[in-house]
């Protein structure tokens, strides 16, 4: 099936587009960022204004590119730049239009970023949403159809692999966290440091943390966006922290799936969804606060056989859970086509 895929041609968006290709679809990637420019100012403008003026830049070229692809389905990744005018015009193709978002467009963390998404929401055939609570909110805003999906790992990007010894030495760590700074994360990290946890952090914006002076010695570098280096950092750590975004009201995140899929040991906040995903103490370890997290980490670092056993069992559970891109996307496409009455 021909699919016009609107989304970045990099990162996890590219993972999803590639997974659609592995499922046998003919995918044309149409990246809105090409017409906006890849600049931090684009993201800041979206955050503050909801993308005011973006439609004038992207509507015509994106519409032209989609029509040229002659799709049987349009797949929109995130969709924060696509407003109702563009969606109405895309609707003239008379094919299902699907939106997948792994952020929370109904929370306040991202400012005005998802203004256009919310305005255009009723024009999608199907929304694939990563949070249960968002389903009711989407319906309230006029969604035609919405389905809840779990976060996913990618079959290729997040498969276990051997790491070059030099690369492994570069990323070697006792307890690692890979992720962007958020206000609640600074105090958490400082508490771990104060309790003697040997911590390594990779991620952007940590210099903004009020606690930066204490965190700086443990910051190993900016965010890791290369698939092989991300895998190396996970597999070179004895314990991998999976922190949630309070502003996004997370109960699990992509890290919750990716870390065990790669074969790393997941150490994350105890939530209802994490407890569904993994058996505590056997397939992953959980905590309620920094104090418990520090105690759990120290215990595991002193018991290597137990640490290896949990990492191994967590990987096996991740495979059984099957929260990977290909089955998730296959289910989304099937529902969209069936719901649209256009199975072909």
For the regions a language model picked out, list residue spans one by one:
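Conserved acidic donor-binding segment of nucleotide-sugar-dependent glycosyltransferases
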Residues: 253, 284-290, 299-304
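A short, histidine- and acid-enriched strand-loop-helix "catalytic/donor-clamping" loop
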Residues: 98-111
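Acidic (Asp/Glu)-rich catalytic clusters
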Residues: 89-92
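Short amphipathic alpha-helix in glycosyltransferases
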Residues: 97, 175, 284, 298, ...
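Nucleotide-sugar donor-binding catalytic core of glycosyltransferases
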Residues: 1-47, 54-65, 69, 77-85, ...
